[in-house]
């Protein structure tokens, strides 16, 4: 499986495709309409903040991906006070059809970051499936003031509400139970250079 973030600025849709070991395209997975950017910039993925993660469950039953940050209609990118509401997509790996979606909220920007007019980010950049409902998530943040920070979490979807029927989360975030998250490791504690 290969994923692409697309290019929201040029209205190039994200995609997920399955290829054989010799490079032949086997199938293109359906991307739900609400993820596709429109020409007004009012819905869909944000540029360079889409499907960076991709993982299969050990039994190869499900394929997971997630947006790196919120869809335009779901909320904002992270700030110093709040995280960004991402969507985790769970596909049936055999049929290639999306079968569930869950809310995942990133951590806020690192303390000390100055987001005013500067490059700052924090996003959900990778997932590793443990089973059908548990995953490892990796969040990577950057600011000129703090440099790169990376945190590893264990997440559970078991008590998270399914959100695939919700076109927008912006006004409903307080009503939706997100994936549960537990910090496993802040890589800053390892005292090694992060990039």
Located regions from the model:
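Sequence/structural signature of beta-propeller domains
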Residues: 1-195
